[in-house]
Amino acid sequence: SYSNSFSMAKSIISLLVGCAIEDGYIKSLDQHVGDFLPEFAEGNKAKITVRHLLTMSSGLSWDEAYSSLFSTTTQAYYGKFLRKLVLDQNVVTDPGKEFNYLSGDTQLLSLVLAQATGKTVSDYMSEKIWSRIGAEHYALWSLDRKDGIEKAYCCFNTNARDYARIGQLVLNMGRWNGEQIVPEEYLAETLQPTTYLADKDLGGIPTERYGHQWWFTNHRGHQVIFARGILGQYIFIVPELN
């Protein structure tokens, strides 16, 4: 049966960014978002790069609060104009300084992907990953409205077995049945904590728990890489235990 990924979708978007770099649609992680989105071509927004979005260090004003009826995230879930909502955000902290978990950063990545590739995020996902990993079922991505855009920060829908295939793909460093689907070099960087960023929620200590849209922890001496959704959705990867 289908299950909503919630924020595990963020980790999927990260994989697609790697594919887009390999395909030449995005020049590098340090390419500016304003190259793709004119709303980010001037002022402080012009400083923001693809890397800043991947590492949740954009410095944007997005209010992530889930318990508020009026937060930006609530508007994203229930509103019908997600593109405008995310493009209207302002810079409140210098980009590239602080890890601050913002769903808007991932949504912006999806807009970059769509603009860069000329394809919907769903179509690009189907082409680059889903059709190549032996997925047993179709996947669905919720839209903000009929004929709208994907809620890329959340709301990818498939079954547990096919979510596990995503985990296996990452464990294999982007390879599936001998084919390199996501660039290994990209994943090697993606799966490293961004210790050069101050962790806002942990008092400014170096960020050990997050990379490029993937989480990290340790369990019984083993490194654990994981995608996480707010309502208990997880893809766990423990490389040392295969």
What are these model-predicted stretches?
Residues 42, 94-101, 149-157, 227-231:
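Solvent-exposed loop and edge beta-strand segments that line ligand/cofactor-binding
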Residues 168, 176-195:
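A conserved catalytic-loop motif detector
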Residues 136-137, 188-241:
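Active-site Gly/Thr loop motif
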Residues 105-112, 152-175, 233-242:
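Active-site-proximal alpha-helical segments within enzyme catalytic domains
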Residues 18, 34, 51-54, 87, ...:
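Non-transmembrane alpha-helical segments in soluble domains
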Residues 4, 23-61, 88-90, 116-153, ...:
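Active-site helix/loop module of the DD-peptidase/beta-lactamase fold
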Residues 1-29, 53, 109-113, 163-169:
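Active-site SXXK
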Residues 52-55, 100, 137-141, 155, ...:
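Structural recognition of the beta-strand scaffold that forms the well-ordered cores
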